[in-house]
Amino acid sequence: MPYFSRLILFLFCLVVLVESRKPKKRRWTGQLETSKPSHLYKKNPDMTKIRHGKPQPLLRVDDHDFTMRPAFGGPAIPVGVDVQVESLDSISEVDMDFTMTLYLRHYWKDERLAFPSASNKSMTFDGRLVKKIWVPDVFFVHSKRSFIHDTTTDNIMLRVFPDGQVLYSMRITVTAMCNMDFSHFPLDSQTCSLELESYAYTDEDLMLYWKNGDESLKTDEKISLSQFLIQKFHTTSRLAFYSSTGWYNRLYINFTLRRHIFFFLLQTYFPATLMVMLSWVSFWIDRRAVPARVSLGITTVLTMSTIITGVNASMPRVSYIKAVDIYLWVSFVFVFLSVLEYAAVNYLTTVQERKERKLQEKFPCMCGMLHSRTMMLDGSYSESEANSLAGYPRSHILPEEERQDKIVVHLALSNESSSSRKKGLLKGQVGLRIFQNTHAIDKYSRLIFPASYIFFNLIYWSVFA
């Protein structure tokens, strides 16, 4: 037993000796200690590497229920809106829509976001805070597509003032429907509207209004379109009613566009006018040149058909007549009538030649007098040639006032043996002179067609321009 007590005492002394030889640990003080204290080696602490405690948040977002609107159960919360239009990107006649890029800003007051501030300065946040607080649920009525820009981050800004006033701004591109009237196209003006409205809150919960009236809408002076002249931007507001939900405040961004006519003058009106004028060349071509006049008429008709097809391909299929349709189809009718004019001339020429052959077969002794008479009336032969063929020498050409009577008397004396043949001859060559003289139809067409087309243009441009 004494031996065991001695052993325990020995072990205890050994443990005390070992513990006394270990170095003592020092607490970290954040100060750099050196063996040689000097101001050359003294360093200030790096505050970026010092761990701070969690600061007390100024906006107590977690202390409130932001699923409810501000002042829930009370009067409607007023939400002011202003818009700055950055660009009007495109206008589509086929789809009847427009694309616009704009800055949309909302203003309202939420006392739950009020915070103490000695300097009365606001705090600015990005889009991450938007998901934690209440914001107005404004959407674009009749919108087809829209998105918030996200380069390089979501283009959303939230600014909160100490008294709870909130500014909520975002950059949006929206494509919306525009009801267009093309009855005066391309001499038309179009008025389009971008409409804003709360999706869930009626006018009893949310009062949407333009913050500064007409001054709430600002536009960039550099906005321009290739086919349109932007005439006016203005704002309006009214109530919209839905039978299942009630009345809603709706804001309108209205703008008026007037189409540039110069592009369509070059692409549509000028080519159509040239085709009509080209069809008139047929009236100066000899009526016996069938291939030339027929090919010219067919070419102008097909070209007009191509112009009409090209214009309609770039337009919506509306159920009413457009101004450009009137011009193109009237021009097409003029071109087509020039083809019909030659068809009539060619037919009458064929009928006339057939009658001449029959008369020559009945009266072979006329020695070419009837033929010479017809040729002179047609204008295909000169005066001296006609009189020479009729038996008159060149030295006996009569004055103008006696020439017609002389020739008629000559023909009448040649056929006085038969009263029936005399009546038929006078009826065929004097009574129907204009209708048998197919050259006269071309002569009258040279005046009637241009005069009618010019008259049509005067009426058209005075009505639609």
Swiss-Prot record:
Cystine pairings recorded for this chain: C178-C192
Gene3D superfamilies registered for this protein in UniProt: Neurotransmitter-gated ion-channel ligand-binding domain, Neurotransmitter-gated ion-channel transmembrane domain
Localization per Swiss-Prot or TrEMBL: Postsynaptic cell membrane; Cell membrane
Range of residues in the leader sequence: 1-20
Sorted UniProt keywords: Cell membrane, Chloride, Chloride channel, Disulfide bond, Glycoprotein, Ion channel, Ion transport, Membrane, Postsynaptic cell membrane, Signal, Synapse, Transmembrane, Transmembrane helix, Transport
Superkingdom of the organism of origin: Eukaryota
Chemical reaction(s) catalysed: chloride(in) = chloride(out)
Gene Ontology terms: cellular component: chloride channel complex; GABA-A receptor complex; intracellular vesicle; postsynaptic membrane
Pfam families (UniProt xref): Neur_chan_LBD, Neur_chan_memb
GO MF annotations in UniProt: GABA-A receptor activity; GABA-gated chloride ion channel activity
GO biological process, one term: gamma-aminobutyric acid signaling pathway
Broad class of where this protein is predominantly found: membrane
Residues with glycosylation annotation: N120, N254
Residue spans crossing the bilayer: 261-281, 294-314, 326-346, 445-465
Extracellular side: 21-260, 315-325
Membrane topology reported for the UniProt record: Multi-pass membrane protein
Residues on Cytoplasmic side: 282-293, 347-444
Residues at which 4-aminobutanoate binds: R105, S169, E197
Domain writeup: GABAARs subunits share a common topological structure: a peptide sequence made up of a long extracellular N-terminal, four transmembrane domains, intracellular or cytoplasmic domain located between the third and the fourth transmembrane domains.
Family label: Belongs to the ligand-gated ion channel (TC 1.A.9) family. Gamma-aminobutyric acid receptor (TC 1.A.9.5) subfamily. GABRR2 sub-subfamily.
Record text on subunit structure and interactions: Three rho subunits (rho-1/GBRR1, rho-2/GBRR2 and rho-3/GBRR3) coassemble either to form functional homopentamers or heteropentamers. Rho-2 is unable to form a functional homopentamer. Interacts with SQSTM1.
Function of the protein: Rho subunit of the pentameric ligand-gated chloride channels responsible for mediating the effects of gamma-aminobutyric acid (GABA), the major inhibitory neurotransmitter in the brain. Rho-containing GABA-gated chloride channels are a subclass of GABA(A) receptors (GABAARs) entirely composed of rho subunits, where GABA molecules bind at the rho intersubunit interfaces. When activated by GABA, rho-GABAARs selectively allow the flow of chloride anions across the cell membrane down their electrochemical gradient.
Protein name per its UniProtKB record: Gamma-aminobutyric acid receptor subunit rho-2
High-level lineage: Eukaryota, Metazoa, Chordata, Craniata, Vertebrata
Gene, per the UniProt record: GABRR2
